[in-house]
């Protein structure tokens, strides 16, 4: 269900704003999107796993708040990010 540390490091390198960046909204949104995708695959197979479903909903909400923040601060970075991640908004 969770993404591997190696995959997380790849996402951080791809979406970071500067060399030591790990906490920018872009990085957080990219990592959350990967975790949401992995959890979605798990829930397709395990339909009655309501505990994981609640975790998924919390992650989606956290990502939504980060996307709203990024959109309010820098609309261009927001548009580039949702296009590269393939998020419908």
Swiss-Prot record:
Name of the protein this chain belongs to: Small ribosomal subunit protein uS15
Primary role: One of the primary rRNA binding proteins, it binds directly to 16S rRNA where it helps nucleate assembly of the platform of the 30S subunit by binding and bridging several RNA helices of the 16S rRNA.
SMART domains cross-referenced by the UniProt entry: Ribosomal_S15
Keywords: Ribonucleoprotein, Ribosomal protein, RNA-binding, rRNA-binding
InterPro entries tied to this protein: Ribosomal_uS15, Ribosomal_uS15_bac-type, uS15_NS1_RNA-bd_sf
Summary of subunit composition and partner proteins: Part of the 30S ribosomal subunit. Forms a bridge to the 50S subunit in the 70S ribosome, contacting the 23S rRNA.
One example GO MF annotation: structural constituent of ribosome
Biological process terms in GO annotation: translation
Designated gene of the protein: rpsO
Statement: the UniProt record of this protein carries the keyword Metal-binding: no
Keyword Ribonucleoprotein: yes
Species per Swiss-Prot/TrEMBL record: Staphylococcus epidermidis (strain ATCC 35984 / DSM 28319 / BCRC 17069 / CCUG 31568 / BM 3577 / RP62A)
Similarity annotation: Belongs to the universal ribosomal protein uS15 family.
GO cellular component: cytosolic small ribosomal subunit
